Amino acid sequence: MVLDCVSTGKAGHAARNEGINAITLAMKDIEWFNTYQFPEKSDFLGPVKMSVTIIHAGTQHNVVPDRCEFTVDIRTNEFYPNEKLFELIKSQVGCEIKARSFRLNSTRTDLQHPFVRRAVMMGKEPFGSPTLSDQALMHFPSVKIGPGNSARSHAADEYIGLMEIRAAID
């Protein structure tokens, strides 16, 4: 889930210590996003992860900003559907928040599903992926498989090694 957040202050001249600094207001909420830990942790996905990824504020060096916009990327687990998580967050922060969408929740396939059990019999180990995929739109049991290391996703030098491809084929 992605949240667009806005902290609103009051513009003023920096030299006269006027106004209410929207950046200072946003910092309190950003600190909450950086430190809060939801109590329910998934065996496969771990805790809910919240990362502030974009911040925009201010227009001039001598003006106290009246608006600070920031974006939060949230990776949920099966204990917190997006709408429930949104309401919990809304009750904790002072900024205005809007979710871009509620439809892409985390997913999990039962470990007792025949496909998962067969994969385990073949020596594969079930795991959780914190990344988002089309799997979130599938309303039937599914698994996410393929070569490579998810930790290299979205990096400047993203790649899959030839040996990883060969191992996946075998």
Question: What do these predicted ranges mean?
Answer:
Residues 2-170:
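Metal-dependent amide/peptide-bond hydrolase catalytic core
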